[in-house]
Amino acid sequence: RYMEQVSRIQRPHSVVHENDFVPAFPLASALGPDGRVYTPADREHYAVNVFRPDGTLEKVITRPDFETWHRDKRDMRRITALFESWAGQNPATWPRFDLKDTERAIAALHIDGQGRLWVQHSRSNRDVPDGVFLAFDLYDSDGVWQREVRFACEGNPVSDGVRFLRDGRVLLIKG
């Protein structure tokens, strides 16, 4: 077992905690061609656990200068609307939502055909020039930071995503 999170959700509940419904590691894990497993260490920090195929922790890749994106009013409306849609159609039965004031530090992890790690983080779609879809941090196969790579293509970074194919291509997934 590489990582585990136990969430106890009791119904009826008066409080729903964001971390119970949206844990970081299942949403942003990647499997390398050599069997290594890459997962965020937690929700709040830019730290990627790298596990060997036998489950032992090999290393943690960090970016100490990284500051997680703090949600503004628009971000809070978006995440609140998402939780309200999960809660059902009757607002009278909704619990209170315990939502974080930051986005997840690491939004997605990808491993390309060369074994390089691409990190999509909470700032990947923020403060980027017009025409840039997402910015990624690129690490070599040893976990050494190489550079920021910006993807210039059509797309909505909130609703669209990418998948890295083993042959070097990147697939844009709309919607």
Where are these regions (language model features)?
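Eukaryotic scaffold repeat domains enriched in small/polar residues
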Residues: 1-175
